């Protein structure tokens, strides 16, 4: 309404996905920047158009799809799950069985992506529906232990079904990201090789990044729309007060099972895309650490929110790269003189007799970059749970509300 932008005249206007012109313009700018990022046309962000960063951003988009699925179960329905990696593995191996190439020791049907990608989500969803009757009978800590058990069961199965997974430490090749009608040799759109679009030379990383922007946006839109439907309101009622929700007529068992199935669909699709994006994956990759990363994403980003999950995905995926870059910069400073060199020598342990937080040698003292990332994940989860339960999205709300209320503080 003109002059009253925050006044919604109807329920439909209040529950719209993009309720204001500002949000619509912001989303349009975001898509414009994202789709032109590989062309390195955006001032100040040209470095993100390099292939190494496009791979990192592509992984973040895939993680966002998986995290949106976990957010349905944990953020919307309030059910704690540490078994997300298991459902991602189910989706990944469904994809490789349907789309992978067969050999003397490996199973593969060679079907196109428009079959194996939806099938990965569907099979993972059916697996989640099979697990749900057992999982919905418990809650809280007991539910967490049940879902942890899925990860260890999956790890055992993935390692030993060698004609599907390729075996521990070996893995197998996943089907490429390309569009075909059926099993023909040439593809309609090959996203796994360098080429040209509209006369412009683009790398495979750029092609896959644009594809993942589109796919992840569709999943984010579905996630956002789910929150405002009858199913989403039932999830929120169960999360906030499950007994009261059941008294009011919400079928708790049915909606919890539905939350597991929907969450598993997102996880299966994300697992298939992740394995195809990197080309191969060993069975050990679908472990508990992967599940913890997704827990970190929704807690750091903001549980129950779409924007928070997207922020958390980019944050968690980019932290290891930023830590690696930061430690490399500190290592360059250790041989120089000055206050920065003193700080670098204090933080880094460059020799066996040094004392430092981060080690630069595989067998020396200090934490490795991988271990430091785990410490950062844990510390950030604790800090956000204590000081800002809504995560990065909560910080954004504080900044936005301060800006809207300035110069007043109330």
Across the structure, where does each feature detected by a protein language model lie?
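Transmembrane alpha-helices and adjacent helix-loop boundaries
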Residues: 1-410
